[in-house]
Amino acid sequence: MTYYGGKELGAAFRTVRKNTIQIAEDIPENKYDFKPAPDTRSVGQTLVHIALSSGFQHHVHSNKINDLKVVNFPELMEKIGSEEAKPRDKAQIIAMLKSDGGKFASYLESLSESFLAEQVMMPPGAEPATKSRFEMLLSPKEHEMHHRAQLMTFERMIGVVPHLTRERQARMAQAQPAQR
């Protein structure tokens, strides 16, 4: 028995996605084109990238691929890249975050411990040579958290206090003893 299975993976992913959606809602639509530097993704592009980023892992594991050398990486990356490039407004991006996130979380919740324990061969030359499906399926959450940290920095740059900071500030204010 493990302490962290499919249900826990799904719940953790839902929590991370909920926070990403809150950031997407907090940033004004007229700031979705904001880029902190010319050669980086904009707010909107980063959110779309997040929404689509679980697609690779979903493809690998829902198709029960056990050796990544059979994956046509150029074709898959081209497909994801063309989907990322489609223009979308704020409402469409938030809807995509909700829909794709919900589908992936539900998929995670359906997975058995035995499936999560299966080993998948990495591409030739990769270290380690194999990874468990469990480890691989953690990566979309980790990847999203990486980009969410970027988005929270973007928020500060455009004058928005991140929601987690606002919540912490509210808790701290409530904890202060009443002033006389």
Regions found by a protein language model. Give the residues of each.
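Generic detector of intrinsically disordered, low-complexity, polar/charged segments
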Residues: 2, 78, 98-99, 156
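Short, contiguous alpha-helical
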Residues: 10-14, 21, 33-79, 119-180
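Membrane-helix exit/interface motif
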Residues: 28, 57-65, 108, 112-115
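Acidic/histidine-rich alpha-helical segments that form the ligand environment
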Residues: 79-121, 130-146
